[in-house]
């Protein structure tokens, strides 16, 4: 071995000893790759560190364990190409243990046999051939690395500029700290002169000149670039300008930081645009909570939208309405609902209503299908959808008969039924000599309201006699119709209904139903299954009930109060 390494190198080597212990442990776990690099760095620190490293590795190589020998040989083989030249020179002078490892042998392992001994001998032969090879490139000698001093004010390299106020990192420039400080002051003076000097390129002189002796404060270049004049902005930049207003519950008291800037005086011009952009950004998160809002608030939000803010909604409506088929497929409907959840649902609904006017029948049908999907989704309240769509759907329903008219009427009835609104169900009398039509409860399927000025295609089979709440003498139970009697008595009359009816029964039937009505039971309630009874209801009450019924029908109908207070207004 060479001379004994100094004490400082030995103490420094003790800090790296845990790395070496982990890399040469006596187990079958391979040495991690990053430890090879850490061990190679030890050989480059100093000559004493290389001597200590080689001494430790040779001591571990002299161990009787095959796992330790194999790990040490692999580390030495890595250091032949990545270690320092001084380490390679010392290793060549102390290669006796490497020669002994080429003949390493022992009792075979019960499980692995002689495989470990063979690996150690092969690694020792590779290390010897690499170590004494003539073609081995000599690694460049690296000077010992000087660790940078730690502490306040320490510099990573000598003769560097002082770090602090006015410090600029320039690796190419060299000079004293005084020269660096003077150059910093000179550059700052140039910036101030360029900002104050009038010129065509000065951004401060692009504004209007002061009139008379009016005071105009100087504006630094950073402030002018930060707050440009809104009049010179592009439309896209104007749309992104936020309005300055108080927002309760926000950080900083809810006031924007632009209140003290020169551009805050123009904030009132962009308040509508910012309100529209806020409504668009909140449509995805507030869509599911819209049922708790009033329709009036939603209408005010819809009025504050600008046309330029609805470009994504317009593209979605064009994609939905322009398709090869008349109806929307399930995939198209699901994609439409998903996109609406991310956009402004109110704007999409208004654009769909605009597509119902002046477009082809196919586009109208696809737009109606999209509107119908709003009714089945939880994007907007049903009351708000009905408020926006009622006028357009009524105009379409009043048009010429066709699929568009039927679809619009169906959607309107569905929305009215979902909102619980009672729409009128009065029908004109079929005969001029008959009594007034009896008012029955609203039935969505059997009593549709025909559009004004159009022909009635579907008519209810019969009207239901409902006695309103009025001070009219109640008929006796013997004269009540089957619809108003007890269910047990009605069942008894149906069993005994084989008797022929009288002339008065026929007259009463004519006063209640139209001539073309073929219902066998005029007193049955309006139902989808009317006319499908197995037993004909031909037994009618006594003639004395006709006079009482006429008295009842002459009184104005009194609607039953609803359980919802807002429907009784």
UniProtKB/Swiss-Prot annotation:
Function (record text): Associates with the adapter-like complex 4 (AP-4) and may therefore play a role in vesicular trafficking of proteins at the trans-Golgi network.
Source superkingdom: Eukaryota
Region (Disordered): 196-298, 467-524
Assembly description: Interacts with AP4B1 and AP4E1; the interaction is direct and mediates the association of TEPSIN with the adapter-like complex 4 (AP-4), a heterotetramer composed of AP4B1, AP4E1, AP4M1 and AP4S1.
Topology relative to the membrane: Peripheral membrane protein
Keywords annotated in UniProt: Cytoplasm, Cytoplasmic vesicle, Golgi apparatus, Membrane, Phosphoprotein
Compositional bias of kind Basic and acidic residues: 506-515
Record-listed Phosphoserine modification sites: 400
Protein name: AP-4 complex accessory subunit Tepsin
Residue ranges occupied by any ENTH domain in the UniProt entry: 8-141
Biased composition (Pro residues): 470-480
Location in the cell: Golgi apparatus, trans-Golgi network membrane; Cytoplasmic vesicle; Cytoplasm, Cytosol
A cellular-component GO term for this protein: trans-Golgi network membrane
Chief location bin: Golgi
Species name: Rattus norvegicus (Rat)
Compositionally biased region (Low complexity): 260-292
GO molecular function, a single term: protein-containing complex binding
Statement: the UniProt record of this protein carries the keyword Phosphoprotein: yes
Record field: compositional bias (Polar residues): 219-229, 494-505
Region entry Interaction with AP4B1, spans: 525-535
Residue ranges, annotated region (Interaction with AP4E1): 559-569
InterPro entries, sorted: ENTH (IPR013809), ENTH/VHS_tepsin (IPR035802), ENTH_VHS (IPR008942), TEPSIN (IPR039273)
